[in-house]
């Protein structure tokens, strides 16, 4: 049985042009919790999807400054994790958890 904390670590799959390109190199991209560490992300992916993770790379996309009705605001920062899977393993991100 999976730990409920794993569901707090992985927020959503990131489906972009770049993430579909890296899927050919056996990698998947997820939006993760801001405070999640690489070992926590690795454990969550292995527990939830039943795959072997070989590497985890993370990045923080800074929120953009936007204007709404004349008032300046800022979008939230988003932390992404690029997960490299073992050979022969894959994750179908189009289905839910």
Curated annotation (Swiss-Prot):
InterPro entries: Nucleotide-bd_a/b_plait_sf (IPR012677), Ribosomal_uL23-like (IPR013025), Ribosomal_uL23/eL15/eS24_sf (IPR012678). Keywords: Ribonucleoprotein, Ribosomal protein, RNA-binding, rRNA-binding. It holds the Pfam family Ribosomal_L23. GO terms for biological process: translation. GO terms for molecular function: rRNA binding; structural constituent of ribosome. GO terms for cellular component: ribonucleoprotein complex; ribosome. SUPFAM superfamilies: Ribosomal proteins S24e, L23 and L15e. The keyword rRNA-binding applies. Gene3D superfamilies: 3.30.70.330. One of the early assembly proteins it binds 23S rRNA. One of the proteins that surrounds the polypeptide exit tunnel on the outside of the ribosome. Forms the main docking site for trigger factor binding to the ribosome. Belongs to the universal ribosomal protein uL23 family. Part of the 50S ribosomal subunit. Contacts protein L29, and trigger factor when it is bound to the ribosome. This is Large ribosomal subunit protein uL23. It comes from Sinorhizobium fredii (strain NBRC 101917 / NGR234).
């Amino acid at each position: 049985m999976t730990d409920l904390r794993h569901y707090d670590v992985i927020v959503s799959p990131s489906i972009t042009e770049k993430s579909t390109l890296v899927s050919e190199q056996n990698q998947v991209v997820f939006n993760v919790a801001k405070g999640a560490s690489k070992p926590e992300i690795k454990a969550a992916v292995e527990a939830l999807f039943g795959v072997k993770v070989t590497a985890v790379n993370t990045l923080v996309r800074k929120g953009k400054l936007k204007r709404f009705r004349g008032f300046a605001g800022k979008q939230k920062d988003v932390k992404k994790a690029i997960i490299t899977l073992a050979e022969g393993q894959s994750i179908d991100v189009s289905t839910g958890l």
